[in-house]
């Protein structure tokens, strides 16, 4: 990527990085290690692995619902520094949506950095005052018979939503199922992808 291919924000980030390295404030190797960690060892692909395992292994799902930290560790995943990570399951009768009303508390190790909309004041306030309206804006319309639970993530407790497994996925293996799980579905503002959507 040449300098001319960079966006103005990328140019500023590169300039800031260069200044910090030149001034001895940042170790380039440590910075590279941090980037490598975020690219390979944290992110929504890890949360998707947890969800896919829960979809195919009822005993694992029970352990996940009982203690998400321990269940994630079973898969060799570090759920991050939050003392408590709670997994909740969306069903035909109950749907969960996660918000942090104070800032942007979020299970980064399993879902990666939070999306900009998750940190925005409109989402943080409307997810509490008008959660069905927010879901509708994301393309999720719940029936009147579905109980909607809004979960407030904090510094002490983070949430991972286990979305409903899509229909038509009985023959898929765990990796194929994980490809259907999106970050937004693990926050509760979207459904997982349909098998045809993931293949496209």
Located regions from the model:
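Terminal, compositionally biased segments used for targeting/anchoring and flexible tails
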Residues: 1-200
């Amino acid at each position: 990527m040449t300098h001319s291919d960079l966006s103005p924000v990328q140019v500023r980030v590169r300039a800031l990085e260069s200044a910090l390295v030149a001034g001895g404030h940042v170790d380039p190797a440590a910075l590279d290690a941090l980037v490598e960690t975020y690219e390979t060892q944290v992110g929504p692909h890890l949360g998707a692995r947890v969800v896919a395992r829960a979809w195919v292994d009822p005993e694992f799902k029970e352990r996940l619902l009982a203690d998400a930290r321990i269940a994630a560790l079973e898969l060799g995943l570090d759920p991050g520094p939050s003392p408590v990570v709670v997994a909740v399951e969306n069903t035909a009768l109950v749907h969960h949506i996660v918000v942090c009303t104070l800032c942007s508390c979020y299970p980064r190790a399993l879902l990666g950095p939070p999306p900009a909309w998750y940190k925005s004041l409109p989402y943080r306030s409307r997810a509490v005052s008008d959660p069905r309206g927010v879901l509708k804006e994301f393309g999720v319309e719940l029936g009147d018979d579905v109980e909607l639970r809004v979960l407030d993530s904090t510094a002490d407790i983070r949430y991972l939503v286990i979305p409903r497994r899509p229909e038509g996925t009985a023959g898929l293996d765990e990796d194929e199922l994980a490809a259907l799980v999106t970050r937004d579905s693990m926050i509760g503002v979207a459904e997982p992808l349909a098998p045809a959507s993931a293949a496209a």
